[in-house]
Swiss-Prot record:
Gene3D superfamilies per record: Cobalt-precorrin-4 Transmethylase, Domain 1 (3.40.1010.10), Methyltransferase, Cobalt-precorrin-4 Transmethylase, Domain 2 (3.30.950.10)
One of the record's GO molecular function terms: precorrin-4 C11-methyltransferase activity
UniProt organism field: Pseudomonas aeruginosa (strain ATCC 15692 / DSM 22644 / CIP 104116 / JCM 14847 / LMG 12228 / 1C / PRS 101 / PAO1)
Catalytic activity: precorrin-4 + S-adenosyl-L-methionine = precorrin-5 + S-adenosyl-L-homocysteine
Residue pairs linked by disulfide bridges in the UniProt entry: none
Protein family (similarity comment): Belongs to the precorrin methyltransferase family.
InterPro entries from the UniProt entry: 4pyrrol_Mease, 4pyrrol_Methylase_sf, 4pyrrole_Mease_sub1, 4pyrrole_Mease_sub2, Cbl_synth_CobM/CibF, Siro_Cobalamin_biosynth, Uropor_MeTrfase_CS
PANTHER family tied to this protein: COBALT-PRECORRIN-4 C(11)-METHYLTRANSFERASE, SIROHEME SYNTHASE-RELATED
Recorded metabolic or biological pathway in which this protein acts: Cofactor biosynthesis; adenosylcobalamin biosynthesis; cob(II)yrinate a,c-diamide from precorrin-2 (aerobic route): step 4/10
Keywords, in A-Z order: Cobalamin biosynthesis, Methyltransferase, S-adenosyl-L-methionine, Transferase
Stated name of the protein: Precorrin-4 C(11)-methyltransferase
Length: 250
């Protein structure tokens, strides 16, 4: 018996991995985060028990996993995006270890990747930014020392900010001294879902643009020069003079 923490991807059912889809269709027990996982992902399952965990607390979820273990039944524990990023699987894994229950993490497509695809851009451009920082706004969960937005902004790297659209004004206030008012920003709401929306602007004008769209949750904020960069240098990867194992020199 194994508990599979499966990344369902950002919303589009076609973006789940082949392995994740196969496990959902094979496992006799499915626990899924119904608030963020589309029902279409569960199509074709043969499970005898399917539970939406949106209204359950940690203790109740762990008990369901333990019950499945006692019955010798594999569990598809389906999370949105990639479960290793803000998936709250750490505390579940801790309980599984204490109970001696095997588990496996099946990666998923991240919201950041889906947003970059929607925007049609690369997040790491030569001589513009080679660093992408995934972070969140500090609301109920406090940030460790040195990880405030102000601290991270000093690097001027590309930022992907989760769980922050409701606090956008404070985010802009913290970033402005480091990035400047002209720094490009994109706010993507429900990336890859049928009703996905995007708003593009700068730190200087993004607030009224987002307010007009009334985004409340399930939005990602991307910040950085890569979002509007033009005339950047080509990478060395495909340069004719660049030699490597598959393109050796003569």
């Amino acid at each position: 018996m194994t508990v599979y923490f499966i990344g369902a991807g950002p919303g589009d059912p076609d973006l789940i991995t082949v392995k994740g889809q196969r496990l959902i269709r094979q496992c006799p027990v499915i626990l899924y985060a119904g608030s963020l996982v589309p029902q279409a992902l569960l199509e074709g399952h043969q499970a005898g028990q399917v539970v939406n965990t949106a209204e359950l607390d940690l203790e109740q979820i762990v008990e369901l996993l333990a019950q499945a273990h006692r019955r010798g039944l594999d569990v598809a524990r389906v999370h949105s995006g990639d479960p290793s990023l803000y998936g709250a699987i750490g505390e579940q894994i801790r309980h599984l270890r204490e109970l001696g229950i095997p588990y496996e993490i099946v990666p998923g497509v991240t919201a950041t990747a889906a947003c970059a695809a929607l925007l049609g851009c690369e997040l790491t451009l030569p001589e513009v930014s080679q660093t992408l920082i995934l972070t969140r706004y500090a609301a109920r969960t406090k940030m460790p020392e040195g990880e405030s937005l102000g601290d991270l902004a000093r690097h001027r790297a590309t930022l992907a900010i989760h769980l922050g659209v409701a606090h956008l004004a404070k985010i802009v206030e913290e970033l402005l001294p480091h990035y400047g008012a002209d720094c490009p920003v994109a706010v993507i709401h429900r990336a890859s879902w049928p009703d996905q929306e995007q708003v593009r602007g700068t730190l200087g004008d993004i607030l009224p643009k987002v307010a007009a769209r009334n985004f409340r949750r399930t939005a990602l904020i991307l910040v950085g020069e890569v979002l509007a960069a033009e005339g950047f240098a080509d990478s060395s990867l495909y340069r004719a003079e660049h030699r490597h194992l598959y393109r050796p020199g003569e």
